[in-house]
Amino acid sequence: MKPSVILYKALPDDLLQRLQEHFTVHQVANLSPQTVEQNAAIFAEAEGLLGSNENVDAALLEKMPKLRATSTISVGYDNFDVDALTARKILLMHTPTVLTETVADTLMALVLSTARRVVEVAERVKAGEWTASIGPDWYGTDVHHKTLGIVGMGRIGMALAQRAHFGFNMPILYNARRHHKEAEERFNARYCDLDTLLQESDFVCLILPLTDETHHLFGAEQFAKMKPSAIFINAGRGPVVDENALIAALQKGEIHAAGLDVFEQEPLSVDSPLLSMANVVAVPHIGSATHETRYGMAACAVDNLIDALQGKVEKNCVNPHVAD
């Protein structure tokens, strides 16, 4: 008899078929208490869980006594109670490598669109404001040869540094938990403390996961240390930034502009002051949102769940010691 798994995110037909070759698959719309209650028998028997954008906490795990592995279609897993999963010896699988290049593309797009005011001036053209040769009020700022500060030199940080160094001749500063020898050798990146990075960078790109240590890592104190001409980019996790402090820094002119793919609350409220600022490029968490990459992430998540329930946890596992 095939193990039972719950799928709470739609999959392409071929990936669903692959999953069904190994498991009895039960599809649900979400993991809300109402859904769990209505499908209590299914949740009670499930050995696997696959999906994204839902909280998996101790209360849910209490309803799933046979759960052995959960697989998320994402690299981030701050919506999972890792301690609760680990205490119950439940494996947590994620997709850390599939989206690296695409997210780095998004970061570079935010750098370019904020510096060159692409969104702002495009809207002005559509509004009929381009009636003569443009003047300084339409100008942006150069990207090439400007200093890029990367906070978080992981896979995505490395991919961004590659684009910036080779494509735009940008000097690279970085701050991370440890020195990154490859970044220093390949891109001539310079490790520095966070204060130095903030003070010297023309672009500050934040690429950090959300943890207890990183929550509101960026606040009023950090923005005050940046150049008035600096541009802030966040494509990591929204709550790493105190959004009210960011809004205040933009309003006071402490920083020049911001390119944001993530926010403290998502979707972003239509009343957010960020949406009325011409110097803010706000996009709806599109970091990995291409057809190719989202398919690759889903395929990886399916393979991860198959591997996990077969006892193979050599890669993509957040808590591999559970299998020991």
Swiss-Prot record:
Keywords: Cytoplasm, NAD, NADP, Oxidoreductase. The active site is at R237, E266, H285 (proton donor). It comes from the Bacteria. Catalyzes the NADPH-dependent reduction of glyoxylate and hydroxypyruvate into glycolate and glycerate, respectively. Belongs to the D-isomer specific 2-hydroxyacid dehydrogenase family. GhrB subfamily. Homodimer. NCBIfam families: PRK15409.1. This is Glyoxylate/hydroxypyruvate reductase B. The gene is ghrB.
